[in-house]
A protein has these predicted regions:
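Flexible glycine/proline-enriched surface loops and loop-helix/loop-strand junctions
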Residues: 1, 79-80, 153-154, 208-216, ...
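Hydrophobic helix-coil surface modules that form long, contiguous segments used
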Residues: 1-141, 170
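Active-site-adjacent bridging/hinge elements
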Residues: 68-71, 119, 138, 142-145, ...
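Second-shell loop/turn segments in exported
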Residues: 78-87, 128-130, 157-158, 214-219, ...
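Zinc-dependent metallopeptidase catalytic helix centered on the HExxH motif
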Residues: 129-190, 246
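Conserved glycine-rich, hydrophobic/aromatic-active-site segments
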Residues: 191-231, 237
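Amphipathic alpha-helical substructures
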Residues: 219-262
Length: 262
């Protein structure tokens, strides 16, 4: 992992954004601007991102455990900038508050969390700055969960991708269980029932399948079945030991990488 300084030059009226924090905007000749972004937390190469278009932008504050605030930034296409879509994305703030009670404080608290709209229908958990082509709350909480499970603690090899995707998939269920106003256990059961998979395949990607993108990012095995493995671990350990295990796992492999054997 490494830290990043990235300068993006874009013509007006485009807005350019990336990982980390915006440290400055330089006005250049020819109706251009240079946006300078920087990270202080190390990140993996595949989590680097940048995007530039005629975004509408806004921000809200997340109140941190330490009593401060962290900006939550949103970059949306003008044609999709509606009150309903803004409200949907802003649900990430109560998600942050809920997930910190389960996983610890948001791991990049001195930078930001952000969502930027993209042209594919799912999401991608770039560190501090998620790409989303949807306003679906399940996608939003899944990608937010990756900030702990995938970004802070990253899978060591593509064989181990289930460590990223299984924990993020289970984050969806935990949000259903613990979000404000939740029914608790019934909500957890309902969320997990929608992720059942009884077919063949292992959560660990075999070497022979590493050239197959669809085997690595398989919704049945490396997502849903992996989410059930995490759920079963919780059942076997019990809640206290399970969440203690998550804390130890985070502390041991923070800003590093873990393999299945770990």
């Amino acid at each position: 992992k490494f830290t990043l300084d990235l300068a993006l030059t874009a013509p007006d009226p485009l807005v350019a954004a990336s990982n980390g924090v915006l440290v400055g905007v330089d006005v250049l000749s020819g109706a251009r601007k240079r946006y300078r972004w920087s990270t202080s937390y190390p990140l993996s190469t595949y989590l680097v991102c940048f995007s530039a278009t005629n975004y509408n932008t806004w921000s809200v504050n997340y109140n941190t455990l330490a009593g401060g605030t962290m900006p939550v930034l949103f970059y949306i296409y003008p044609e999709h900038d509606t009150p309903a879509n803004r409200a949907a994305w802003e649900q990430v703030v109560p998600m942050l508050t809920t997930l910190r009670t389960l996983f610890g404080e948001y791991p990049f608290i001195n930078e930001k969390y952000g969502i930027y709209e993209c042209q594919f229908g799912g999401g991608m958990e770039h560190q501090t700055f998620t790409a989303q082509g949807t306003f679906d709350l399940g996608v939003t909480v899944h990608e937010l969960g990756h900030q702990w499970w995938g970004d802070l603690v990253t899978c060591k090899t593509w064989n181990d991708i289930w460590l990223n995707e299984g924990f993020a998939t289970y984050t969806e269920a935990l949000w259903a269980e613990f979000k404000p106003g939740s029914s608790g256990l019934p909500a957890l059961k309902s969320a997990m029932a929608g992720k059942k998979y009884f077919g063949a395949g292992t959560v660990y990607v075999q070497n022979a399948e590493l050239g197959n993108l669809y085997a690595i990012f398989d919704g049945n095995t490396t997502y849903n079945k992996a989410g059930w493995v995490v759920h079963m671990l919780r059942h076997v350990l019990g809640d206290a030991a399970f969440f203690d295990m998550l804390a130890a796992y985070r502390a041991t492999y923070a800003f590093s990488a873990a393999a299945t054997a770990d």
